[in-house]
Amino acid sequence: GKVLYGWFDNHLCYISTTIDYLESKGLDGKKFWNDSTIYHFIGKDIVYHHYLFLTAMRLAINEEYKLPEYIPTRGHLMLQGEKFSKSRGWYIGLREFLKEFPADYLRYYLSRITPYDQSDVNFDWDDFQVKINNELVANIGNFIHRALSFTESKFNGIVPEFEEFDEEDNNLITKLTQTKKEIELYINNNQFDKAL
């Protein structure tokens, strides 16, 4: 016995919300929806809603709006090893989170810890601090800052034209090209944790 709750409305809201937003920006929302590659990132507990109900609803409206091509399914998000529970007050409210941290911190952390499978994921505040401070800020942010600062101080903010490549340059280009291909493969396979 499955319960429908508000799933009929929810599926239609994906479409109507997207279309309303795009049309408020002067774009043809229906065309945008139907021309896009559609992903529905869902939790493992609502698989049947997306694979059965969503499909049936779209077919019932004569396929006027295309179905998602991909439905990556993830595990549950835990907080400090326990299941989120709004009724017990064991959750992180998005508004409260965003008062303390930039949205990019949440995007980075969740992408970094979420594998492309249905195993549960644990949001741990200590791990969040380590990954944000040591990876995002100290490694990625510092690298970008140093590269841009160097370019600004040595070349007035303009990357100079190269004169010729030596063997070391060619080796670096080969390594960067291979790394780019690996990252693209991970991203195309929704393995954002590995891409990072």
Model-derived segments and their meaning:
Residues D126, I158-E184:
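Acidic, turn-prone loop/beta-hairpin segments
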Residues G1-S153, N189, K194-A195:
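Structured secondary-structure scaffolds
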